[in-house]
Structure formats: C-alpha cells, structure tokens
Swiss-Prot record:
CDD domains: MIP
GO molecular function, one term: water channel activity
Protein name (record): Probable aquaporin TIP-type
Membrane topology type: Multi-pass membrane protein
Family to which this protein belongs: Belongs to the MIP/aquaporin (TC 1.A.8) family. TIP (TC 1.A.8.10) subfamily.
Name of the gene: MCP1
Domain observations: Aquaporins contain two tandem repeats each containing three membrane-spanning domains and a pore-forming loop with the signature motif Asn-Pro-Ala (NPA).
Length: 249
C-alpha cells in the first residue's frame, strides 16, 4: 500500500510563524531532555569521583532519561508534536511531516542539545560525557543495536501518538515513549550508551569535541526510525481496521 502523504513542503511553510514556534518548542523540549539526561550522568560521576560504570549508574541513567523524555514529549506535544529527536525522519518517511518542517525541527533539536551541553559544562565545571562505543564493541554490532533500539522507540511513537486508531489514550503516549527509552538504555547503555537520538549525542560531541564513531549515532537512529515509519504506515495505518473500544485514562 502506498505511503499516505510524503511531501517536501514549501519555503513558506519553513518560515511560517507556526513552524518557527514549533521549532522553538522542539528546542526547549530537547534542552529539557538533555539537561536531565546528561546532567544526571555528570552528577553520578561527581558522586563516584569518576569511578567505573556500575549497574546502579546504568539504572539511574535509565530512570532519568525515561522521566525527562516523558516531560519533554508532554510539554511539546500540543505545539510541535513533541518529537525531541531527529529520528523524526521516520515520521517524514511515513508521510506525517514534510521534509522542510522536519529539517526545522532537527536544527532546533541540535541547537537545543548544544546550548544545553555548553550550559552543563558551565554550571557543573565538569565535562559532558560524550557517547562512544564501549571497549570490545564493534562498529557493526553497535550500528545494529542503535537501529533496533530506535526502531522500538519510533514504533512506540507511531502506535501511541500517530496512529489515528489509537483512540483517546491521554498521557499514555509520552509515558510509553519514556518507558521504551528507559528500557532500551538498560539494554544498550553498556555497549553504545543507548543514544537512539542524534541530537542527544550531537551536543556533547560538539562541546567535548569528541567524534569517535559519531556517525553510528546518526546512521543507527535514522535508519531505525525510517524503517519503523515504513513498517507502521504500510502494515497498520493504511490497513482497514475496526476501531476497538477505548478507555479514557
């Protein structure tokens, strides 16, 4: 079945006040997410005197990112859709956002991450941990891991926030999105850092000027997000389906 509405968009759309407001919302949401996520890592390193990574540290990172993403998505949902992730490319592939609007969002997200990372360096007098592959982890497995984790994330976004058959599920969407990120961090954090989001890895990379295998944190999420968008659009959204009974939460 064909994808619904893949479109490039117009220059007028890219500069429309509503698009710019949505871009600002993405900037703020990404700032909030990176501040809590990366900030929690800095705080953990301070408390442990930059000690070795531990299961407790991984769990704390998972919780911090899950809570922060829940908030970041919630506060941006009514303005920009609360994407908070350049893997919004998956929404373009699925025909749910124009290419130009997606570019505006991505620029805003990257700027939000850079500004936040620079601010964290200033207020904590510490370096922002940059994403990198753990010792013994190859580039190929790392790429596949980021693809799979981001597929799960974007698929969750489609199922809970994009699918017109979702019914009225209220705040369940941002909760589910936060939960899948937290769960994926428990899986991939020890191997790649579990980025699933090019913006989250880009800001710390710029501020620390650390680019080792950085392309993995772009290619993995963009491929995984694109596949998720295609799969959900082709197999589920365009399929005839009787609306199930819904419950308000």
């Amino acid at each position: 079945m064909p994808i619904r509405n893949i479109a490039v968009g117009t220059p007028q759309e890219a500069t429309h006040p509503d698009t710019l407001k949505a871009g600002l919302a993405e900037f703020i949401s990404t700032f909030i997410f990176v501040f809590a996520g990366s900030g929690s890592g800095i705080a953990y390193n301070k408390l442990t005197n930059d000690g070795a990574a531990t299961p407790a540290g991984l769990i704390s990172a998972s919780i911090a990112h899950a809570f922060a993403l829940f908030v970041a998505v919630s506060v941006g949902a009514n303005i920009s859709g609360g994407h908070v992730n350049p893997a919004v490319f998956g929404a373009f592939v699925g025909g749910n956002i124009t290419l130009l609007r997606g570019i505006v969002y991505i620029i805003a997200q990257l700027l939000g991450s850079i500004v936040c990372s620079a601010l964290l360096v200033f207020v904590t007098a510490s370096s922002v941990p940059a994403f990198g592959l753990s010792e013994g982890v190859g580039v190929g497995p790392a790429l596949v891991l980021e693809i799979v984790m981001t597929f799960g994330l974007v698929y969750t976004v489609y199922a809970t926030a994009v699918d017109p058959k979702k019914g009225n599920i209220g705040i369940i969407a941002p909760i589910a999105i936060g939960f899948i990120v937290g769960a994926n961090i428990l899986v991939g954090g020890a191997f790649t850092g579990a980025s699933m989001n090019p913006a989250v890895s880009f800001g710390p990379a710029v501020v620390s000027w650390s680019w080792s295998n950085h392309w993995v944190y772009w290619a993995g999420p963009l491929i995984g997000g694109g596949i998720a968008g295609l799969v959900y659009e082709v197999l589920f959204i365009n399929s005839t389906h009787e609306q199930l009974p819904t419950t308000d939460y």
